[in-house]
From Swiss-Prot:
Residues 1-92 form the PTS EIIB type-2 domain. It comes from Escherichia coli (strain K12). It comes from the Bacteria. This is Putative phosphotransferase enzyme IIB component SgcB. CDD domains: PTS_IIB_galactitol. Its EC number is 2.7.1.-. The gene is sgcB. GO terms for molecular function: kinase activity; protein-N(PI)-phosphohistidine-sugar phosphotransferase activity. GO terms for biological process: carbohydrate transport; phosphoenolpyruvate-dependent sugar phosphotransferase system; sorbitol transmembrane transport. InterPro entries: PTS_EIIB-like_sf, PTS_EIIB_2, PTS_EIIB_2/3. PROSITE patterns: PTS_EIIB_TYPE_2 (PS51099). It is an enzyme of class 2 (transferase). The EIIB domain is phosphorylated by phospho-EIIA on a cysteinyl or histidyl residue, depending on the transported sugar. Then, it transfers the phosphoryl group to the sugar substrate concomitantly with the sugar uptake processed by the EIIC domain. Keywords: Cytoplasm, Kinase, Phosphotransferase system, Sugar transport, Transferase, Transport.
Length: 92
């Protein structure tokens, strides 16, 4: 089972919406994954053992884990491209 950390400014509303959209997509694709949420500044404390980090905004930090900006899951703009990136990372 894959593990995904979803982070936003406060670790509440936006990350919850992204995590929900992400779970819907992963279920449709038959990819088994769990999500955890946190705020952006807590990523270093919560990223151990994660396979992917999805954030609500850009981050320049390198956590040693693939990190994607998940804003497209909220807006729907270019979300297909993001979903394909997520699928590729989780099925490699």
């Amino acid at each position: 089972m894959k593990k995904i950390l979803v982070a936003c400014g406060t670790g509440m509303s936006t990350s919850t919406m992204i995590a929900h959209k992400l779970q819907e997509f992963l279920t449709e694709q038959g990819i088994s994954a769990t999500t955890a949420q946190c705020c952006l500044n807590e990523i270093p404390l919560n990223c151990n053992g994660m396979d992917l980090i999805v954030t609500s905004m850009r981050t320049n930090s390198d956590y040693g884990i693939p990190t994607l900006n998940g804003a497209a899951l909220l807006t729907g703009i270019n979300d297909d491209a993001l979903k394909q990136q997520i699928k590729a990372l989780l099925t490699q």
